[in-house]
Amino acid sequence: MTNTEIFNKLTNAIVTQDIAGCAKLTQEALDAGISPLDIITKGLSPGMKIIGDKFEAAEIFLPQIMMSGKAMSSAMEILTPELEKTKVEGEEGTGLAITFVAEGDIHDIGHRLVTTMLGANGFDILDLGVDVLNETVIEEAAKRKGQKIILVGSALMTTSMLGQKDLMDRLREENLRDSVKCMFGGAPVSDKWIDEIGADATAENAAEAAKVALNVMK
């Protein structure tokens, strides 16, 4: 198979919730000399984008999301050790990434991928998990005031995305906004939304998220 064929098959494995097939293809891609980063950005992430768009359009529902998540996890179990081997040591003081999925949202597929990529690019990680209250994010940021921090929030649903605006408002109320950078992602998040709520950045996929985060923290 050509690399393009492998990437297309990986994308399809995510979309069709083929857990065993996704793991097998991931190993085959590594054996063919394809980098973990390319496997993620050109094979797995496009599949997750399709899944996110289908969920937003109500074409699929939670069970399918969960199964696609398991397919992604089967791939990441293979890729994470490889990413660790090639971990980029960030410049001194790259910073701490506090990652979380918005309150009311338990879809952690993209979140886990972004967290992995941030760690692989030199960030220290504090992963708060899924269905995280804005109050919890505020508390964790306040504890570390004075450190270099970027908040990285995910939301797959429009309803949970709206909580990002509340978080930005709370950061300003608590005089924490100037202490942290804020990046949000997920299927419904757009550049227009980021501008509207006064956040710093968004990204199309996990690999881009790591690059954007590094740029924002300069």
Swiss-Prot record:
InterPro entries on file: Cbl-bd_cap, Cobalamin-bd, Cobalamin-bd_sf, Corrinoid_p, Met_Synthase/Corrinoid, Meth_synthase_dom
Domain B12-binding N-terminal positions: 1-91
GO molecular function, one term: methionine synthase activity
Sequence ranges assigned to domain B12-binding in this UniProt record: 94-218
Gene Ontology cellular component terms for the protein in this record: cytosol
GO biological process per UniProt: homocysteine metabolic process; methanogenesis; tetrahydrofolate metabolic process
Keywords: Cobalt, Metal-binding, Methanogenesis, Repeat
Role this protein plays: Acts as a methyl group carrier between MtmB and MtbA.
Family under the similarity heading: Belongs to the methylamine corrinoid protein family.
Self-association and partners: Can form a complex with MtmB.
Native organism: Methanosarcina mazei (strain ATCC BAA-159 / DSM 3647 / Goe1 / Go1 / JCM 11833 / OCM 88)
Full protein name: Monomethylamine corrinoid protein 2
Protein's pathway: One-carbon metabolism; methanogenesis from methylamine
A Pfam family hit: B12-binding
Residues where methylcob(III)alamin binds: H107
